[in-house]
Amino acid sequence: MKNLSFLINRRKENTSDSNVYPGKAKSHEPSWIEMDDQTKKDGLDIVHVEFSPDTRAPSDSNKVITEIFDATEDAKEADESERGMPLATALNTYPKAAAWSLLVSTTLIMEGYDTAILGAFYALPIFQRKFGSQNDKTGEWEISASWQIGLTLCYMAGEIVGLQLTGPSVDLVGNRYTLIIALFFLAAFTFILYFCNSLGMIAVGQALCGMPWGCFQCLTVSYASEICPLALRYYLTTYSNLCWLFGQLFAAGIMKNSQKKYADSELGYKLPFALQWILPVPLALGIFFAPESPWWLVKKGRFDEARRSLRRTLSGKGPEKEILVTLEVDKIKVTIDKEKRLTSKEGSYSDCFEDKINRRRTRITCLCWAGQATCGSILIGYSTYFYEKAGVSTEMSFTFSIIQYCLGICATFLSWWASKYFGRYDLYAFGLAFQTIVFFIIGGLGCSSTHGSKMGSGSLLMAVAFFYNLGIAPVVFRLVSEMPSSRLRTKTIILARNTYNVVSIICSVLILYQLNSKKWNWGAKSGFFWGVLCFCTLIWAVVDLPETAGKTFVEINELFKLGVSARKFKSTKVDPFVVKNPPKDVSHNDPKGDIEASIAEE
């Protein structure tokens, strides 16, 4: 933290002389604060203080003024320190915050795991014979396209319901208890999947399990963004993508084992379902002891608890730690107060579309996450099935899937390095551009029936997975946590994830029709379709997606308020803590309200 000793001394001076505003004349008490006329002309953000006698009690308004301006100075100091904090310093100062964020994000492993095994089941022989039908022409067993679509719709519908339930639950009990409740229900609903004897039971189980998965999707991102400083936010929000990949890799390994050892046994699909019981209990215990988000606590007016929560995320002890806590709480309060000045109501879903600023932020957040589906990533989730339909053997299809997820994990780690040199928009747009080219090549290879073209299309899909996890996938988790206002962050993320789910449903239906031999049977030629859709997503990103790298939440708020265009976000500099229009008269009964209003208006 920059110049902590100065802040400590400033607070001591304020305590010893509460009637004097730091750095101003001591002879009289200010009765109004206004900008100097020449300063206004010059455009300089300097506060000029006029003094005159006041008939009121000598200390009350001065004390309030000092407190308000000190809080704003503290908020600005915290914001500047956060923006300039190196990664090593952030890890040394906030190691506990990083650890708690990693713990909460680990819940996404279960969603990545289960959604991956569902797609892999369609290529598993025992699952095909148990729940599928035989193709009269080829003699092969296959799950019908209608059931594949139905199962996909069930878990995505469950996620949509779960996301909608997450909003009011967080408002009521907070992030921690909402996650614990979701983990409990996930463990309970897994029994339905384990004891399934029909596709109908699997559909019910998937729909019910989808509800806690929806909760995980929202809260892992919002919790990581609110508990960690700017220097760590990219790494810890994109860790959500790593958890997805860990779950998918785990699923690919289990499914390859099932394909080899349990090809003719019900354990081939029961064992993968049973392994979902491993994580809920230890994760629930860990989350119970985790600190609540200080942003949520401040919004609820529980400032002492917010300070305790922040202390649990910081290393060290003594006055410097307490100053860090005070600065951070003041910054959160100023940010939330500025947002509250825009509306007198508690944040609701309708507020996400209430005015031009929030409509823009909501639109960008929703379309940014929807881009994960329209770029063709849903095809990666059905990779084993895709490889098989492209002409690759069943065993090699499972092997390709394992390699694909390993490449994705390596790519996500590489994105952490790339984030030092490239912005969020740069990585997002680069990923879209590369995938557009590769999908067209895959489509072209699909026009040939040679063995080399089949292996080539499979290899290129692995390349798509690599660059998707280098650019688009991890960056989205960061962007969707930065675009919304803090007051509406949880609700905006819920709307965005539901947008993604709806778009994913449409994309999944299209993919299953494209790959199923009884429907369109496009095989690798489906790459042409996804190349076009990916290119359309790239055009949107160029026009509408701002660059937020290196910007704090307060700066992003100000940039949206000023209506800065997407491509000018990166170069535009703002100072959201400057007081440009302080009240001209603080001699009435509520000087605090007027000064807060003048600060909030900026």
Swiss-Prot record:
GO CC terms in record: plasma membrane
Pfam families assigned to the protein according to its UniProt record, in alphabetical order: Sugar_tr
Topology feature Cytoplasmic, residues: 1-106, 164-178, 222-234, 292-363, 419-426, 481-492, 547-602
Topological domains annotated Extracellular: 128-142, 200, 256-270, 385-397, 448-459, 514-525
Coiled coil spans: none
MF terms (GO), sorted A to Z: carbohydrate:proton symporter activity
Ranges of compositional bias, category Basic and acidic residues: 582-595
Induction trigger: By maltose and maltotriose. Repressed by glucose.
Source taxon at top rank: Eukaryota
PROSITE patterns: MFS (PS50850), SUGAR_TRANSPORT_2 (PS00217)
GO biological process: maltose metabolic process
Region ranges (Disordered): 580-602
Subcellular location: Cell membrane
Membrane-crossing segments per the record: 107-127, 143-163, 179-199, 201-221, 235-255, 271-291, 364-384, 398-418, 427-447, 460-480, 493-513, 526-546
Membrane-protein topology: Multi-pass membrane protein
Disulfide bridges in this chain: none
Keywords: Cell membrane, Maltose metabolism, Membrane, Sugar transport, Transmembrane, Transmembrane helix, Transport
Function: High-affinity uptake of maltose and maltotriose. Also transports alpha-methylglucoside, glucose and turanose but not melezitose or trehalose.
Family recorded in the similarity comment: Belongs to the major facilitator superfamily. Sugar transporter (TC 2.A.1.1) family.
PANTHER family xrefs: ALPHA-GLUCOSIDES PERMEASE MPH2-RELATED, PLASTIDIC GLUCOSE TRANSPORTER 4
The protein, known as: Alpha-glucosides permease MPH3
